[in-house]
Amino acid sequence: MGANGTLVECKRGESDAVVFRFLIFDAPSPSSVTAYVKLMQKYNVRHIVRACGQTYSAEAFEKQGMVVHGWSFDDGAPPTQTVIDNWLNLLEQEKNKSPPETIAVHCVAGLGRAPILVALALVEYGGMPPLDAVGYVRGRRKGAINQVQLNWLMRYKPRHQEGNEGSLSCAGCAVM
């Protein structure tokens, strides 16, 4: 059984320096874990964020040196405050890595919970307006992010403002 995902690279401003890579994918099943381990290895993934209930054992990924973070929240809903805090803490930890490691994010179908976390990262660290971030993600993952999640992101107040010391620009984002 094959595995695939959508890789989103975020570059710092006008430069070619990649700040974050996100690999959005659907949840592995017990029979497809091996294919997903290979996919994660291909993109040098070290962190996997599981934004849904557990559908597979993390052991195969952990044996390859990957950390699986279980940060589940309700299907179709925006992330909880705990998930937001955990996600942003992970991004803070990874933002200055050179070269940046890919952060993989999945939910059941890779269309709701995982994409909204990536859109949140684009708003927080890329300084992208929420609609632009959602449009950017939807342009790469058809059907991603529902109206409830979009409305939440539109009301979200970023912790990192563009122009602040910790702010990054994703104006040069590219999908590979």
UniProtKB/Swiss-Prot annotation:
Name of this protein: Protein tyrosine phosphatase PRL-1
Disulphide linkage map: 52-107
Keywords per UniProt: Disulfide bond, Hydrolase, Lipoprotein, Methylation, Prenylation, Protein phosphatase
Compartments (UniProt record): Flagellar pocket
CDD domains per record: PTP-IVa (cd14500)
Residues that bear Cysteine methyl ester: 173
Family, similarity comment: Belongs to the protein-tyrosine phosphatase family.
Record text on activity regulation: Activated in a reduced environment which promotes the reduction of the disulfide bond between the regulatory Cys-52 and the catalytic Cys-107 residues. Inhibited by sodium orthovanadate.
Protein task: Has protein tyrosine phosphatase activity.
Species per Swiss-Prot/TrEMBL record: Trypanosoma cruzi (strain CL Brener)
Residues of the propeptide: 174-176
Entry EC no(s): 3.1.3.48
pH effect summary: Optimum pH is 7.5-8.
Effect of residue 107 to S: Loss of catalytic activity
Annotated substrate binding sites: 109-113
PANTHER family in alphabetical order: TYROSINE SPECIFIC PROTEIN PHOSPHATASE AND DUAL SPECIFICITY PROTEIN PHOSPHATASE
Domain Tyrosine-protein phosphatase, residue spans: 13-165
One Pfam family here: PTP-SAK
GO cellular component term of the entry, any: cytostome
One GO BP: peptidyl-tyrosine dephosphorylation
Catalytic residues, chain numbering: 75, 107
UniProt keyword Cell division, yes or no: no
